[in-house]
Amino acid sequence: LVGSEMCIRDSTTGVYSILDVEPEFVARQMDCVFQDIFPDAIKIGMVSRPDIILAIAKKLTEYQAQPVVLDPVMVSTSGSRLLKEEAVDTLCSRLLPLAALATPNIPEAEILSGHPIENREQMETAAREISGRFGTAVLVKGGHHTSDADDVLCMDGKIRWFYGRRIDSSNTHGTGCTLSSAIACGLAKGLSM
C-alpha cells in the first residue's frame, strides 16, 4: 500500500521538519488504492497525529486489510521525539491491534512497554509484553544498542533472536523503515513470518 500521511524534510543525518496532511486526504488516498488494486500487504510508518491514526485504522478495518506491518515510529535515530504525545494512546488502542507485526526500536519499545531496556532479557520482556497486550507479533529492533544489532521476535508467545553485527556508519537513518518495508514485501509475496 502506498500512501503519504506527511511530508518530511530529512536526510541521512536526521529529521528536520514534518508537515502532516489532513486525515480526509489520507482516507481518500487509501480508498483510491484499495478500490484500484487491493494490496497484498500494508506497511505503516510514521504517523504523528491521533486524527490521522484514526482515519487509517478506520480504512484498514473497513477494507479488512491484512497483513499490516506497523513500524511505530516515535523516536528518531538521533533521539528526537517524532510522535506527538497525545497520539501514542491512539496508536496503541487503534493501530497496534490491527497489525500482524509491530517493529519498534528499543526507545519505542520502552514507550510501548513502559519499561527501560538495557539488555537482552529486557528486550525479550518488552517484546512479550507488547505482543501480549496488543495481540500482535513484535520484533524489537536492537540497533540502538551500542554493542550489537540483535533483534528479538515474539510471535505466539515464542521468542526468536536474529543476530546482527553493528555497522559503524554515520549514515544509518531509515534502517528500521527499510526493514519493516522489506518484511511487508515478503509477506505480500506469500512468505510467512
Language model segments and positions:
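Short, small-residue-biased leader/transition segments that mark boundaries at the very start
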Residues: L1-V2, M6-C7
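Glycine-rich beta-alpha junction loops
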Residues: I8, S48, M74-S76, E108, ...
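N-terminal beta-loop-helix "entrance" segment that forms/cooperates
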Residues: R9-E24, S80
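A short, N-terminal amphipathic alpha-helix
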Residues: R28-F38, R128-R133
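Glycine/small-residue-rich loop that forms an oxyanion/phosphate-binding "nest" at active or ligand-binding sites
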Residues: V33-P97, L101
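Conserved phosphate/ATP/ADP-binding segment of small-molecule kinases
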Residues: E85-I159
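Short, small-residue alpha-helix embedded
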Residues: E110-I111, S169-S192
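Glycine/charged-rich beta-loop-alpha catalytic/anionic-binding loops adjacent to active sites
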Residues: D156-D168
